[in-house]
């Protein structure tokens, strides 16, 4: 889980590498493009990531400036991945005891 708020941006990203692909996307872009970049490609990136890595990913974000909103989503996502893959101790990081 990576969650943060700034002056005008709120975002939350939850990630689970549990072997099933699922994307919950609650982000509404108010522009089709940021410069030459189609904003719809942001969701496409995360959907493709979920499919290829078989993870559950939930992204909720809102804000005014679409460029900064996309940056905030990717930053929260990167923090989430860093926490998810960090090795701590020797125990298996699973409530079921297996991965």
Task: Identify what each model region corresponds to.
Residues 10-14, 18:
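Beta-strand-rich assembly/attachment modules of structural machines
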Residues 3, 14, 46-48:
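A generic local secondary-structure boundary/capping motif
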Residues 1-5, 9:
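Single conserved hydrophobic/aromatic residue that forms the stacking wall/gate
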Residues 25-33, 90-99:
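Solvent-exposed, glycine/polar-rich loop segments of beta-barrel outer-membrane systems
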Residues 1, 14-15, 23, 57, ...:
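Generic detector of leucine side chains in alpha-helical contexts
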Residues 20-24, 34-89:
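Mixed-charge, glycine-accented linear interaction segment located at domain edges/termini
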């Amino acid at each position: 889980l990576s969650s943060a708020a700034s002056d005008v941006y709120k975002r939350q990203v939850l990630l689970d590498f549990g072997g099933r692909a699922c994307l919950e996307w609650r982000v509404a872009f108010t522009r089709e493009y940021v410069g030459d970049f189609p904003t719809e490609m942001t969701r496409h990136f995360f959907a493709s990531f979920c499919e290829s890595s078989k993870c559950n990913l939930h992204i909720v974000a809102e804000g005014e400036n679409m460029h900064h909103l996309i940056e905030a989503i990717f930053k929260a996502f990167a923090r989430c991945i860093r926490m998810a893959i960090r090795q701590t101790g020797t125990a298996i990081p699973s409530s079921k005891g297996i991965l």
